[in-house]
């Protein structure tokens, strides 16, 4: 597959000519437009890359393969292929939610390509066990996935307000709900299973990229203890607790997210 095919497959767009390149990766049930309010702030100073995961947005749905995308590794391979198509050196991957782990896996595979990571609301594992708090019991995850399988639109309407938070701004959860509802139901179900059953805890120590963990308050998907765990287990990581609440600060608090990313890219001496 040539560079043009990869760019078409993942609906890749590139803006700006600065250095380094910032690659924005969206989360479950979303597309690249969920980063628009943040990414636009960097186009004058950086090269900004936006893309859709296969199965989302305006990606090539015919490229979706259940075998390849049966784990996050398939999405990480796509991210590396996008980097190769764009000939990226020393890029920064900025991942929301599950794309934090996708970015981590891509950086492990190509540490020369992705030398810095910004993780927004990351979780390496959503399910609690005896020595780890992920935020959900296995039964809760199973019930969540069953609800999604039985009623995609109902799941979207019920979950969007909980995931978004910020109940005083209902337009935010409505935007997220529209995004959920626009995804292909079959692919969404498979991506949800891959996301919520993933366990990347053992991968964290292998991340050599300089990393920023951005943690929101009152995040039901990635609670504060999870962000602290991620930060503690990535060797070269720093942690920042945002004032923003909910799981989608790229929508609810783009200015604060922009400021945090800028501070990370230009640390004070």
Predicted regions and their residues:
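Flexible "cap/lid" loop of the alpha/beta hydrolase fold
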Residues: 104-109, 113-150
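Acidic catalytic loop of the alpha/beta-hydrolase fold
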Residues: 218-222
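Active-site loop/oxyanion-hole signature of alpha/beta-hydrolase fold enzymes
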Residues: 2, 8, 40, 50-98, ...
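Conserved HGGG/HGGXW glycine-rich cap/lid loop of the alpha/beta-hydrolase fold
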Residues: 10-68
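Conserved alpha/beta-hydrolase "nucleophile elbow" surrounding the catalytic nucleophile
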Residues: 26-28, 91, 95-97, 216
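Conserved alpha/beta-hydrolase catalytic His-Asp/Glu region
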Residues: 128-136, 146-205
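Short beta-strand/loop motif that positions the catalytic acidic residue
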Residues: 207, 213-215
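Catalytic active-site module of serine/aspartate enzymes centered on a nucleophile-bearing elbow/loop
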Residues: 237-269
